[in-house]
Amino acid sequence: MAKVNLYISNDAYEKINAIIEKRRQEGAREKDVSFSATASMLLELGLRVYEAQMERKESAFNQAEFNKLLLECVVKTQSTVAKILGIESLSPHVSGNPKFEYSNMVEDIREKVSVEMERFFPKNDDE
C-alpha cells in the first residue's frame, strides 16, 4: 500500500472527522474508522465517480441528437395519426355518429392528453 502525504482544506478535514465520529457512535471499532482508512475510502470512491464521468463523456450517446430524433418521430406519428383520423371520420360505417366526427375526436384526444400530462406535470399556481 502506497503512503501519500497531502494537504486538504479545513472543511474537508472536519467532514472526514464527522464521518469517523458518526461511525464510532454507530459502534464501529477504532481500527476500522481511522482517519487514514476513511480518507482512503473516500478517495477511492471519488476516483470511481471520476472514472464513471469520464466514461460517460466518451460514450457515443448524444442527448441532443436523441431528443431531436425522438421529437421527429413524435411529429411524424402525430401527423400520421391525424391523417388516419381524418380518413376514418369519412367512413360510411361511422357517418352520423358525433363520437367519430373529426373535430369531436380531436377534442376528445386533447382532453385525455391534458389529463395524462397533468398527472406527470402538475400545473403550478404561478402558471
Swiss-Prot record:
It comes from the Bacteria. Keywords: Conjugation, Cytoplasm, DNA-binding, Plasmid, Transcription, Transcription regulation. SUPFAM superfamilies: IHF-like DNA-binding proteins (SSF47729), TraM-like (SSF140581). It is found in: Cytoplasm. GO terms for cellular component: cytoplasm. Transmembrane segments: none annotated. Gene3D superfamilies: 1.10.287.2320, TraM protein, DNA-binding. The keyword DNA-binding applies. One of its GO terms (molecular function) is DNA binding. Conjugative DNA transfer (CDT) is the unidirectional transfer of ssDNA plasmid from a donor to a recipient cell. It is the central mechanism by which antibiotic resistance and virulence factors are propagated in bacterial populations. Part of the relaxosome, which facilitates a site- and strand-specific cut in the origin of transfer by TraI, at the nic site. Probably autoregulates its own expression. Plasmid specificity is conferred by the TraD-TraM pair. NCBIfam families: PRK13713.1 (NF010267). Belongs to the relaxosome TraM family. Homotetramer. 2 homotetramers cooperatively bind to DNA although they do not contact each other; cooperativity is achieved by DNA kinking and unwinding. Part of the relaxosome, a complex composed of plasmid encoded TraI, TraM, TraY and host-encoded IHF which binds to the F plasmid origin of transfer (oriT) in a site- and sequence-specific manner. Interacts with TraD. Also interacts with TraY. This is Relaxosome protein TraM. It comes from Escherichia coli. The lineage of its organism: Bacteria, Pseudomonadati, Pseudomonadota, Gammaproteobacteria, Enterobacterales.
